[in-house]
């Protein structure tokens, strides 16, 4: 079974070879460019961050999807929250999220980031990072595999391609 990206490339090459030009909508081009040039900022808080590093290594190679890790929130448009979020770290998470450029997306990685995980009943743990920032994609697991993270990123790319216009208006921010 062929990947969806390869089917799109075949369709594009067939159109160009048959007609010599391509007709499309500006919204589709913007969605394609945004989805294929994500710049994630790591927010690794616990053991899930190790799996995130593995997904960026040569075996899985997130670079082939156009993703380039950025050290600064002002240069990134995707935040990957990986690990247990504590009450003390929650204001820092929100501050980093507010510094990111628009449009911005959040991927919650692992049981702890999704809902508190193993430490759910602890007094010091936030029961899901979606209480602090709006989350676009949840990746389950403890810890989730690198394949699960790649799949979550591909789902986020599909979501980004469905958005229209220059302003990201698919959800309300807090």
Swiss-Prot record:
[4Fe-4S] cluster binds at residues 47-48, 112, 142. Binds 1 [4Fe-4S] cluster. Pfam families: Oxidored_q6 (PF01058). It catalyses: a quinone + NADH + 5 H(+)(in) = a quinol + NAD(+) + 4 H(+)(out). Its cofactor is [4Fe-4S] cluster. Keywords: 4Fe-4S, Cell membrane, Iron, Iron-sulfur, Membrane, Metal-binding, NAD, Quinone, Translocase, Transport, Ubiquinone. It is a peripheral membrane protein. Its main location: membrane. GO terms for cellular component: plasma membrane; respiratory chain complex I. GO terms for biological process: aerobic respiration; electron transport coupled proton transport. It is an enzyme of class 7 (translocase). InterPro entries: NADH_UbQ_OxRdtase-like_20kDa (IPR006137), NADH_UQ_OxRdtase_20Kd_su (IPR006138). Gene3D superfamilies: 3.40.50.12280. It is found in: Cell membrane. Its EC number is 7.1.1.-. GO terms for molecular function: 4 iron, 4 sulfur cluster binding; iron ion binding; NADH dehydrogenase (ubiquinone) activity; NADH:ubiquinone reductase (non-electrogenic) activity; quinone binding. Belongs to the complex I 20 kDa subunit family. NDH-1 is composed of 14 different subunits. Subunits NuoB, C, D, E, F, and G constitute the peripheral sector of the complex. NDH-1 shuttles electrons from NADH, via FMN and iron-sulfur (Fe-S) centers, to quinones in the respiratory chain. The immediate electron acceptor for the enzyme in this species is believed to be ubiquinone. Couples the redox reaction to proton translocation (for every two electrons transferred, four hydrogen ions are translocated across the cytoplasmic membrane), and thus conserves the redox energy in a proton gradient. This is NADH-quinone oxidoreductase subunit B. The gene is nuoB.
